[in-house]
């Protein structure tokens, strides 16, 4: 539990403060949040924690529940605030926020899982995290249709 708090959960107060003082658009905020997440968690040894928790959730449900309360719930709340800010400001169309939050964080979970598993042994299919995040934000904001 201490490892989860020290390496991931303790970042949410600062991220929430950054949300409160962010001056840019909601699109810029979304891009910043996803990039910041990669910089502060995904690109560090802490990125292995979610893989371990998910892989062992059945054997250690107390840790999985702790992780959910300390990391997943605050993460979803922050993503929801970003998306709601965009809707309220007329920048994003009205969407189902309950599902939309998953479309934001699921690719980040994939990226972290890839980095700590298949990314270690598949030289021909390496994923550039920064380019992946840029593309993900672009698809989230603009879709793929012309």
Regions inferred by a protein language model and the residue ranges of each:
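Amphipathic alpha-helical segments enriched in hydrophobic/aromatic and basic residues
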Residues: 1-7, 64, 68
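Hydrophobic alpha-helical connector segments
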Residues: 2, 8, 14-50, 97-104, ...
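Residue-level marker of structural boundaries
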Residues: 5, 9, 13, 17, ...
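Short amphipathic alpha-helical interaction/hinge segments
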Residues: 7-15, 45, 61, 79, ...
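Short linear capping/connector segments at secondary-structure termini
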Residues: 14-19, 51-55, 68, 118-123
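Amphipathic alpha-helical packing segments from all-alpha helical-bundle domains
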Residues: 28, 39-48, 52-54, 62-88, ...
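C-terminal peripheral helix-coil segments that are non-catalytic and often amphipathic
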Residues: 28, 32, 36, 73, ...
């Amino acid at each position: 539990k201490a490892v989860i708090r020290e390496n991931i959960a303790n970042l949410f107060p600062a991220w929430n403060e950054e949300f409160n003082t962010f001056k840019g658009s909601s699109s810029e905020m979304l891009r910043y949040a996803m990039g910041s997440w990669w910089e502060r968690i995904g690109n560090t040894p802490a990125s292995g924690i979610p893989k371990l928790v998910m892989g062992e959730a059945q054997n250690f449900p107390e840790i999985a529940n702790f992780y959910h309360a300390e990391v997943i719930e605050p993460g979803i709340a922050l993503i929801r605030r970003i998306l709601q800010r965009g809707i309220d400001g007329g920048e994003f169309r009205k969407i189902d926020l309950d599902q939309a939050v998953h479309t934001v964080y699921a690719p980040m979970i994939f990226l972290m899982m890839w980095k700590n598993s298949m990314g270690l042994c598949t030289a021909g299919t390496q994923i550039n995290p920064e380019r992946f995040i840029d593309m993900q934000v672009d698809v989230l904001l603009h879709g793929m249709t012309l």
